[in-house]
């Protein structure tokens, strides 16, 4: 899906949400026609988004690891749902939970541009990637490429598949100050062999904030017939 269409769909999804989400819906609606590159530098847009968060003012949090802190309207709605589930007890689990899950899947599918049957809703990114890593059809001697700067939980999961299936983990180190994108792409290219099955790569490295050239890495890997897990 094109990023511009994604933003438009996100606007429609936000508008359909309760009144408390009005601030975010308005921010997206006012800027939905702008390209991602223009929107990235639109301070007015990001100020509207920033106003939806209540964060500790003592420091600026630049790390995007651990868990995703929520905009205030979403946090309030999340707590409201938890209270309702706790209030209903087993009745909720045996009745309305499936309707709620199906409705959520349908809305996410509309946003992602796929069918609800293609979606699996997990608790977080770590669980999703763990399932994807562990669910590969691994054979002894298969190779996986990753960087030492990748998220720790993912590296731990690759240790498990190494111990369980005999997978060979090839770990590279991404330079903090590369000359250009090609230097990073070459690191992954040189690690590929006929036995390489998958490359794990972080779009943004959580410990440094460094953004990697994902499109270039993916294009290179696909030319070699290698899957990429971002």
Question: What do the predicted segments below correspond to?
Answer:
Residues 7-230:
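Pyridoxal 5′-phosphate
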């Amino acid at each position: 899906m094109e990023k511009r269409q994604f933003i438009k769909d996100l606007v429609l999804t936000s508008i359909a949400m309760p009144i408390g989400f009005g601030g975010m819906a308005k921010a997206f609606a006012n800027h939905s026609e702008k390209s991602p590159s223009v929107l990235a530098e639109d301070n007015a847009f990001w100020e509207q988004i920033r106003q939806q968060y209540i964060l500790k003012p003592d420091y600026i949090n630049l790390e995007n690891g651990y868990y995703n802190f929520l905009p205030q309207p979403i946090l309030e709605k999340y707590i409201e749902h938890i209270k309702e589930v706790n209030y209903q007890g087993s009745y909720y689990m045996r009745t309305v939970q499936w309707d709620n899950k199906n409705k959520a899947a349908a809305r996410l599918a509309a946003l992602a541009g796929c069918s609800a049957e293609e979606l699996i809703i997990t608790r977080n990114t770590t669980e999703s990637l763990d399932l994807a890593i562990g669910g590969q059809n691994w054979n002894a001697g298969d190779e996986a490429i990753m960087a030492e700067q990748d998220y720790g939980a993912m590296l731990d999961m690759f240790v498990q598949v190494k111990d369980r299936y005999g997978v060979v983990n090839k770990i590279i180190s991404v330079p903090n100050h590369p000359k250009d994108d090609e230097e990073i792409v070459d690191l992954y290219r040189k690690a590929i062999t006929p036995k390489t099955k998958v490359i794990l790569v972080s779009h943004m490295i959580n410990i440094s904030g460094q953004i990697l050239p994902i499109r270039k890495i993916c294009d290179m890997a696909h030319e070699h017939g290698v899957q990429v897990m971002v």
